[in-house]
């Protein structure tokens, strides 16, 4: 799998399978990395969030920031957003308290943007726990991968 770093200051690019997309900006909204999966159904964007917390709820504004940023980076983002399946995988260290419930998307004051909340509601959520050895191997292999 290729590692593809991205930022919003370049030309828009095509979203492809076979790449692990890693944002170049610190504190990227919503996720740490993501990749696209091809299968029998619609293509799926698998979002990866590494966390030690037993909960990792988000806010509508964070979903909005993510959507806006992705629209600046990838060609045809509105079609992708509507047509692709969505998953988020919470990756946790074995010593963390496992996330066991669906993580919420909250609104603060004012009217919520239905598009942001609708996207969050479409995202299937999963949790995986990695032992220290597996986590280290995963990190090492990611570092050795070619850049796109």
Where are these regions (language model features)?
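Charge-enriched interaction surfaces
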Residues: 1-148
């Amino acid at each position: 799998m290729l590692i593809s770093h991205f930022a919003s200051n370049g030309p828009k690019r095509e979203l492809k399978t076979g790449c692990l997309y890693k944002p170049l900006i610190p504190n990227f909204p919503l996720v740490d990395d993501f990749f696209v999966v091809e299968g029998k159904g619609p293509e799926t964007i698998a979002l990866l969030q590494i966390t030690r917390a037993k909960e990792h709820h988000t806010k509508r504004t964070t979903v909005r920031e993510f959507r806006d940023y992705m629209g600046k980076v990838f060609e045809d983002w509105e079609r992708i957003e509507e047509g692709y399946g969505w998953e988020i995988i919470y990756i946790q260290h074995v010593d963390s308290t496992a996330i066991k419930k669906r993580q919420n998307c909250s609104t603060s004051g004012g009217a919520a943007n239905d598009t942001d909340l609708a996207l969050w509601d479409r995202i299937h959520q999963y949790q995986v726990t990695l032992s220290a050895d597996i986590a280290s191997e995963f990190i090492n292999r990611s570092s050795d991968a070619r850049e796109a």
